[in-house]
Amino acid sequence: MVKEQFRETDVAKKISHICFGMKSAEEMRQQAHIQVVSKNLYSQDNNHSPLLYGVLDHRMGTSEKDRPCETCGKNLADCLGHYGYIDLELPCFHVGYFRAVIGILQMICKTCCHIMLSQEEKKQFLDYLKRPGLTYLQKRGLKKKISDKCRKKNTCHHCGAFNGTVKKCGLLKIIHEKYKTNKKVVDPIVSSFLQSFETAIEHNKEVEPLLGKAQENLNPLVVLNLFKRIPAEDIPLLLMNPEAGKPSDLILTRLLVPPLCIRPSVVSDLKSGTNEDDLTMKLTEIIFLNDVIKKHRISGAKTQMIMEDWDFLQLQCALYINSELSGIPLNMAPKKWTRGFVQRLKGKQGRFRGNLSGKRVDFSGRTVISPDPNLRIDEVAVPVHVAKILTFPEKVNKANINFLRKLVRNGPEVHPGANFIQQRHTQMKRFLKYGNREKMAQELKFGDIVERHLIDGDVVLFNRQPSLHKLSIMAHLARVKPHRTFRFNECVCTPYNADFDGDEMNLHLPQTEEAKAEALVLMGTKANLVTPRNGEPLIAAIQDFLTGAYLLTLKDTFFDRAKACQIIASILVGKDEKIKVRLPPPTILKPVTLWTGKQIFSVILRPSDDNPVRANLRTKGKQYCGRGEDLCVNDSYVTIQNSELMSGSMDKGTLGSGSKNNIFYILLRDWGQNEAADAMSRLARLAPVYLSNRGFSIGIGDVTPGQGLLKAKYELLNAGYKKCDEYIEALNTGKLQQQPGCTAEETLEALILKELSVIRDHAGSACLRELDKSNSPLTMALCGSKGSFINISQMIACVGQQAISGSRVPDGFENRSLPHFEKHSKLPAAKGFVANSFYSGLTPTEFFFHTMAGREGLVDTAVKTAETGYMQRRLVKSLEDLCSQYDLTVRSSTGDIIQFIYGGDGLDPAAMEGKDEPLEFKRVLDNIKAVFPCRSEPALSKNELLLSAESIMKKNEFLCCQDSFLQEIKKFIKEVSEKIKKTRDKYGINDNGTTEPRVLYQLDRITPTQIEKFLETCRDKYMRAQMEPGSAVGALCAQSIGEPGTQMTLKTFHFAGVASMNITLGVPRIKEIINASKAISTPIITAQLDKDDDADYARLVKGRIEKTLLGEISEYIEEVFLPDDCFILVKLSLERIRLLRLEVNAETVRYSICMSKLRVKPGDVAVHGEAVVCVTPRENSKSSMYYVLQFLKEDLPKVVVQGIPEVSRAVIHIDEQSGKEKYKLLVEGDNLRAVMATHGVKGTRTTSNNTYEVEKTLGIEAARTTIINEIQYTMVNHGMSIDRRHVMLLSDLMTYKGEVLGITRFGLAKMKESVLMLASFEKTADHLFDAAYFGQKDSVCGVSECIIMGIPMNIGTGLFKLLHKANRDPSPPRRPLIFDTNEFHIPLVT
C-alpha cells in the first residue's frame, strides 16, 4: 500500500489538542457500522467472496485496489475505513487497564462499592481536585496518595464491611483475601463464614489451617458489577475523568473490529489462497470462542468447562491487544507469535518511531561519495542520473517562462529537462515522456507548475548517518556532473565525519522557495564553519591540503616566475576567474629572481589589490622551540600581518580544524563567512596542484632504520630490561618499597609499566633525530596532517608495551600469559612488551599480544557506539523543546523556566572567540593596530587612554552590553595602559615630553582612533555573539554533549600520581551523571584540610575518617575458658595505634563494642589496663554459650572502632604547586556529611563527585554545580572541550524541579507532561493506557508532538506568531468609488 497524505476536507485545520479516553460499549456500537458475528472469513461458494457479517466484510472498508468500500463507496486511497464490533458472551479484563483495575479494587469497598475514605478525607481530596491548573504529574501523584490511604484501611466507612487485600494471582486473575482475618477485628460476614465450617473442623482437623487461606476470586463479571455500582461522586477520587470514561469501561464487554485497511488480506499468486493479517486471525479466534461459550451456556455444560473457555477467551482478548504477555500456562500458549496492537505501536519500527516521528521521504537520493578539491566548499557534485530524477516544482512567471519552455521541450530524458507539468486550474499532472512536448511548451501559462530537473545552483541538503550533531546535515549548492558519485570538497569531511572508503551519503532537494531560503541561511555550509559545541572551526583544511601548505611555506621553498605564476593560476577559476592577481615583488633578485612559497600563500589570503581582507595572526606553530617568537629556529612561529605571511610554516594548528588560532577562523570572525570560505576553496585548489607537481609519496624506504638507530634502540632496550630485572629482584628479596595504597605486586607492575612505556618514547625521539627532514612520514607528523611520532616510532624502532585495561597482559592459565613462558614470569617479553618494529616484523608471541590489545580496542568501540547512541537519544528527547525566548529566558514548550538567561550571559557558544569568552581582547587590539596604523596621530599616555576609554564606554551604544563584559574591557585596558607606562618609563619618556617620533612609533602606542575602533569592534562582536531568540538551545546542548561521547573510551582510568585510586571516566561516568545514579561506581570525596602543609596532620585526619576495624588494631582476639566463666579477650596493639596516629584506646574500644549491633551491654565489657578488653557473652534461650562465644569471636574483629563506616579508605594526595607541597585527602566512600563534620577537615572546601550525596547534604544548587563540574572534568580528561553554557543548561534541566532528575524514562516522566512525547520515547503502550485512564488532554506544544501531528513547531522560525513586514505604505491607497465619475455629478440648479 502506498502511503498517501490524509486530507479529509480542503479547509485548512489545525489540531489544537488531543484528548485520550476509553470508549463505553454504547459508544462502540454507535461508532461501528456492523456487528461481526461469523467466524468464517469467506463464503463457501465459487467466487470466494468475503462473508457478510464476517471479519472481512467489505462494509468495514476495502483492502483491494479494484473494489470500492461498500459503506462510503470510495476507493482504497480515499476510504478511511469503518469499524465493526463483537459482543463478548462474558466480560473480560482489558490487558492494558489490568493494573488500573487492581488499583481501583484496592481503593473501593468490595461490598458497597464506596471509596474507602472517611467523609472528611473525601472532601479534602475533592477540594484539591477542583484546582483548575492540576497537571498530569500532580494527578498521578494524587492517585498514589489516595491509593496508599485506602490500602491502609480494612473497614469500610460507609457500610462497615471488612476488606482484605486485593492482589494479582496468575495470568489476568484477581483475588480478594476476604477471610484472612486479624484476631482483633471480626467481621460478622467473616465470622459466619468461619462458623459454617465448625462441624467440618470437628471431623477433619486439617481444614482449620486452610480456612485463613480462603480467597474470593474476583472474575471480570464480579468486577464489572462492582464498578457499575461505584457512586458517581466517588469517580473523581479514582482520578478518572467522567467525560472520558467510567470505571465500568475498563472491563471489555464489546470489542471493536478495526477497518480492513489496517489489516489487509494479501492474495498470494503462488497458491490459491490469501495471507491474512494477525489481527484478523485473532478476531476469528475470539468469535469462535464466543460461539463455544454461547453453546455451552445454552446446553448447560459444566461450570468448569465454561470457566476454562472463559479463561481462554480472556487470554485471546489480551493477546489481541498485547501479544507479548508473560506467564501464559503451557497448555494455553499460542503456537506462533503474532503482532498485537501494542507491538504495532512500540519499538523502533513501530508507528510512533517508525512512521510518525521519522519517515522515509521522496525527493532524496543516496550514493557513494568521492573527493573533489576543485569544487568550492559550499558545492556538491550530483550525477546526471540523479539530477534527472530529483525534480523541483517551479512556478511559471514572466522571468522564467522561456527557460521553462526549453526544459519542457527537453523532456525527462535530456538534462536539463522536466518530468511533469501541472496546469494552474487542474489538479492533474501531465507526464512529459509521452505526448507532444512542443505543444505543451507553447501552452505554458503564468501560474502553471513545471517539475524541472535539478540544475546547477539548486540548494540541496546533504547528510551522512549517523547524524550526531547539526553539522551532519548541511545545505550545499548543486553542480550537475557526469559519473555516478556525489563529490564534495574534502574540507567538509570533518563535520560529516566522512571518509572515501565506500561511505554513502544522502541528498534531499527542498521543494519550496521558503525551504530553500531557510536551508541556505540556517544550514548553509558557510553558515556552519564552526561547531556550536565550543565555537572551534570544523570545516577547515585536512590531510593533503595541510601537507601541501606546510611544504609550500617552508623556509627553503623558492619558485621562478613561471612556476609561481603557474601555481597561482590554479586559483583563477569560478568566481575568482576574472580577478587580477598582483604578483608580489620577488624575494631574491640576483642572480635569478625567485619568489618564496610564503608569498604564494599570501596570495591565497588576498589575491588582488581590490580585496579588502587584511587578516592578522600571531601564534605558535606545532614545532615552536619555545623562545624568540618569529626568530624561532624551526620557523614555527606564524606571523600574518595584513594578509601577508611574514614568518612560520603553516600546519594543522593554523589551517586545520579544532583550533581558534586558525587563519580561516580569523577570516571568519573579522571578515565574514564568505571570505573564509573563499580562502579555503583557494587553498583546496592550490595545495594539491603544488603537491602533485612537487611529488609526495611514502614507501618502505621511508621506514627503514639506519645502523645508528638500531644500535641506540638496543642500548635503550638493554637499559630498560636491566632496570626491570632490578625491580623483580628487589621484589623477590623483599626490598621493593611499596607505593601508598598498593601491594608489592601492584607496585612492581606500576614501576615496570612506567619503565617500559618510556622505552618506546625514547626510541621515538631517537627516530626523529635520525630521520632526514624530507622523510614523508615525518613531514606528515610534523604538519599534523596524519599520524604521530608514536606511529613513526612503532614502524621504525619499537612497537612497545601492549596494555590491556591499562595494565600489562594478565596471566591467563596456570599463572602464565602463554605456554611459551615460565610460570609466574614477570619478564617484559612474557607480559606483552613488543621489542620489534613493524618494519622488522613481530614474533608469534608478540603478534599474539598485539592482537589482544587491538581486539580490546575493537570491542570497546562496538560497545561504546550502542551506549552513546542510546545516551544521545535520551538527551535529545529530554532537551529537544528547550528554546531561548524573546525575554532571554530558556523555557520548555509548556512555559516552564529552565534558565532566566541562557548560560548566565545570553551568549551563543558558537560565537565564542576565547575559551568560553566572547572576545580575545589582545588579538582584537593587535588586529586594530595593524589595520589602522594611524601614524600621524599622537600616542595616548596611560591616563589619557583610561579617560578616553571611559568616555567612549559611557555612550548609549554601550548600554546594551552586560556590566560583566564592560568590566572585562576595563580590566584589559588597564593592563594595556600599565604596560605602556612601564615601557615609557623604561625609555625615560614622560607624558608631556617630546621625543623623536620614530622612536616613539616603535614603542607600544595607542592612538585615539585605535581605541575608538577597538571598543567599537568589541561592542559589535559582543552584540553578534548574543544567542538569537528561537534558537533550539536544548537540542544543541544534547548534541554537544552526546557527540564527543562517541570519541571517548569506556575505560576506567587511574588518578594521576596516586596508585590504585580508581576513578570512573569516559562514557560510563557521563552515563552515571546524567542518569542521576544514587550509587555510583567510584564515589570520591575530596577533603581540604585546615593545615594543608603538614603531612603528620594529614595522617591524623585520615585516621579520623578512614574506617578502622577492631581486628586491624588487635594483636589477638581469643576465647578464654575458665572453670566458672568464659569470655573473649581482646589485646590491642598499642604500637600499631601509635604508628597509624589513631585516637583509639581501650575505653573507646569498649564504647564501640557496646554501640555495635552485637547486643552486648556495657556491663559485659571490662577494660583491664591500657591494652586489654574482656567481653563476656550472655547466655540466651535460643543457643548455647559456646555458640554465642563463637559468634562473638567472629563478629568482634568487624567492629568499627574509629572512622566513618561508609568510608572504605582514604588516601593522602600531594599537590606540588609553586614548589610547596600541599596535602589533601581523597576519601573513597559516600558519607559526605560525616567527612565535612570531621575535626580537621575544611568543611566549606570539601566536595564529592556523587550528585545524590551532595544534594542530600548541601541542597539542589550544590548538586547543580556538581553536575557541571563533573561533566566538564570528565570531558577535559578526554581532551574534549565543551562550552560551559551547554553543561549549565543540562544541569539546570536536571535540577529545575527541585530534585535531581535523571535523563531516563523515569526522570523524563517527571519532567514532561505530554503523552505523545512520552509514548514516542519508551513504554509506548503504558503511557497511552495511563492517559486514557486519567482522561488526559495533550495540548500538542512540544517538538515531538508537533512532528507526530505534522504541525510546525514553535521553535526557531516557528516561534513568532506575526511577521512584521517593514517599508510598506503607511496608509492604504484610496480606491475610486462608483460615484466619483463626473456623469453622476449633476449640478444643482438654484
Curated annotation (Swiss-Prot):
Chain sites annotated for binding Mg(2+) 2: 499, 501
Localization annotation: Nucleus; Cytoplasm, Cytosol
Annotated organism of origin: Bos taurus
Substrates-to-products reaction catalysed: RNA(n) + a ribonucleoside 5'-triphosphate = RNA(n+1) + diphosphate
Protein name: DNA-directed RNA polymerase III subunit RPC1
Role this protein plays: Catalytic core component of RNA polymerase III (Pol III), a DNA-dependent RNA polymerase which synthesizes small non-coding RNAs using the four ribonucleoside triphosphates as substrates. Synthesizes 5S rRNA, snRNAs, tRNAs and miRNAs from at least 500 distinct genomic loci. Pol III-mediated transcription cycle proceeds through transcription initiation, transcription elongation and transcription termination stages. During transcription initiation, Pol III is recruited to DNA promoters type I, II or III with the help of general transcription factors and other specific initiation factors.
Annotated residues for binding of RNA: 464, 503
Zinc recorded as keyword: yes
UniProt GO MF annotations: DNA binding; DNA-directed RNA polymerase activity; metal ion binding
Record note on cofactor: Two Mg(2+) ions are coordinated by both the catalytic residues and the nucleic acid substrate to enhance substrate recognition and catalytic efficiency.
Annotated positions binding Zn(2+) 1: 69, 72, 79, 82
Residues binding DNA nontemplate strand: 144, 167, 1159
